[in-house]
Amino acid sequence: PAKEVVDWDMYLGPAAWRPFNPRLLDGFNFEKGGGMMGAFGAGGCLEWGSHCVDLCQWANDADGTAPVEYEPKDGQLHARYTNGVKLVMRNDGWLPLGSCPVRFEGDKGWVETGDDGELVASSPELLVNKGAKIGGYPADFHVRDFLDCVKTRAQPRANADAACYSHIACHAANISLLLGRKVVYDPVKHEFPGDEEANRLRSEALREPWRM
């Protein structure tokens, strides 16, 4: 939209004041929009990474926690949970199995899948009696799951903790990438113990008169 029809002050919200920039209005276009700007979004690590990390959290039975160590290595981000499980975030090297790919590696090999539901393994034996396609997880499944949980009082698959901590993991990963070094995170206190430089990046100063 044209500058004349944009309430720029309201659009900026609590972010620091800056001159009108039409590129920042395309916040959900991560190729050219404001989603890559720290004041308006956390870039691809949060936008795409959270969709993959939540599956890794689920597989590790870690919906209510997050990795405790994060370190950039060779263009990737390596993280570690308290139980020793490692999480690696990377931009490339995936099989063409749809968006949001995940690979699970163990002492017997690896299994990889994506949004299209196809399973590919390092060894055919890993898929014996499991099938080669598990099907996607359509959005209406989440609706049905939520409504069922309203009745049963169980936790839905996509519960609040799953969303919260997968995003926390991605934010901590971003901080490690920004600093270019290893950081240690406490998922209970939600802080980087003894690391003021990392702790300062957990939030930004709010522009007056905004409060949170």
Task: Report residues per predicted region.
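Contiguous beta-strand/loop segments that form the cofactor/metal-binding neighborhood of enzyme cores
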Residues: 1-161, 165-212
